[in-house]
Amino acid sequence: MRHSNKIRDEEMVNNTRLNXXA
């Protein structure tokens, strides 16, 4: 299940960008 890990990482980055807001 490596694909799930990659998708999770991308979601985490997207969340950080939104939080960030920047």
UniProtKB/Swiss-Prot annotation:
It comes from the Eukaryota. The N-terminus is blocked. Residues 1-11 have a biased composition (Basic and acidic residues). Residues 13-22 have a biased composition (Polar residues). Residues 1-22 are annotated as: Disordered. On the 2D-gel the determined pI of this unknown protein is: 7.5, its MW is: 38.5 kDa. This is Unknown endosperm protein L. It comes from Hordeum vulgare.
